[in-house]
Amino acid sequence: MVGNGIDHHPTKAGMVIAWLFDEEAKAVFGPRPMITDLRTGAMAGGSGEQAVLTASAIQMARHYGLPSSTIAGATHSKLPDAQSGYEKCLTVNQSVQAGANIITHTCGAQASLMGISFEAMVIDNDMLGCILRATNPVEVSPKTLSAPEIGAVVNEVGHFLGETATFDRMHSDFLYPEIADRADIEVWEAGGSIDIRQAAARRVQEILAEHRPNYIDAGVDRDLRALLPIELLPLA
């Protein structure tokens, strides 16, 4: 595994060549170390070893003071299940913690990047939001410490729920997942006892039914459809 780092030198060489042609050329150090399961020869993109190699490549970029790009979020699972979740979170979180500037392939990919799942995209969106929230620095200041509010609560009402500072922190300090379940058991059972894959499937159907972005002028859209056999839903 350590020798894998040698393979990153051609990437740096390519950047040097670009700068020889143009000193102002924009270049990103983007190594893609990948792990193979030696029992089968298949890619093991969701493994702990993959997380370590990716982090080491990113740290190499930081050592040289270069902006970095990498891939993370691969899983060998064919479905957006528990294996998919832990493998994706492992490699994405490790890459973020290592300091990657750009991370691709983080959302929706299944079966070692050979397939895409809409449900996985929705689930992974929650996961990625939590990872990014976990990497935000904690701001320590008189305002965030809220010592006067703490003193007032201790000596008076006995709880923070009615405080303005609590309401403000609710909107500034917390990220609320879109589909992850945080209800108590009774509410969950009353809602049909669905798991996250079922919740994601519902959200996918809502998005497909309601989200109709219009990026192309209606006239251009008609001309393209008349010229080419494009089998897409017409613009609303």
Model-derived segments and spans:
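Helix-rich catalytic cores of soluble enzyme domains
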Residues: 1-101
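Histidine (H) residue identity feature
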Residues: 7-9, 63, 76, 105, ...
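Catalytic-core signal marking the mid-to-C-terminal active-site face
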Residues: 119-236
